[in-house]
Amino acid sequence: MKEIVIQTDKLCKSFSSGGRQQHVLKNLDLSIYKGDFTVIMGASGSGKSTLLYALSGMDKPTLGEVMYGDVKINHLGISDMAVFRRKNCGFVFQQIHLLDNMSVLDNVLACGLLVSRDKKAVAARAKELLGEVGIMKEDWGKFPSQLSGGEAQRVGIVRALINEPAVVFADEPTGALNSAFGEQVL
């Protein structure tokens, strides 16, 4: 039997709009299994990003539970949630926000060293991952302003993977990539 990584139980999320409740997620029961590639598709405004935020702990549901194994993440406090996300979740968004005053390599190391204190191991993994997405050694010292949109996106993907997260949340992760790199990333 496959291991469940994320499970929801009667997940609901509502927003107030103009004095009315807008129900975006209603009693959602969902199981995501280790090793699976799960895609959430829908029309604009259908709740995809709302679901991503709830599953990742970036926003609390109105009702229901989000569980990683036996950890009910929507009951974690702010600091515990931050630690949990750093160790268990990777994030790739269409708009990548790299740290402007840091090189490509330092942008990746900064994320890796939030979880591990083994700088040598983190650096080795960072260099390996950067190579896998086509960011070569001569580009590691570049700053974000010197990168193309696709290069910045690939650095963002490496940052999401550096800590070997249990789950990677991606919201249009290949939007800035050419088709060859888009296929490689997926």
What do the predicted segments below correspond to?
Residues M102-C111:
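Short coil-to-helix segment of the ABC ATPase nucleotide-binding domain corresponding to the Q-loop/switch region
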Residues G64-K72:
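Conserved ABC transporter NBD signature motif
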Residues S56:
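Helix-to-loop junction immediately C-terminal to a conserved catalytic motif
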Residues V71-K72, K120-E138:
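Conserved ABC ATPase "signature" region
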Residues V168-D171:
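Catalytic Walker B motif of ABC-type/P-loop ATPase nucleotide-binding domains
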Residues E164:
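Conserved catalytic motifs of ABC-family nucleotide-binding domains
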Residues F143-L147, E151-Q153:
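Conserved ABC ATPase signature
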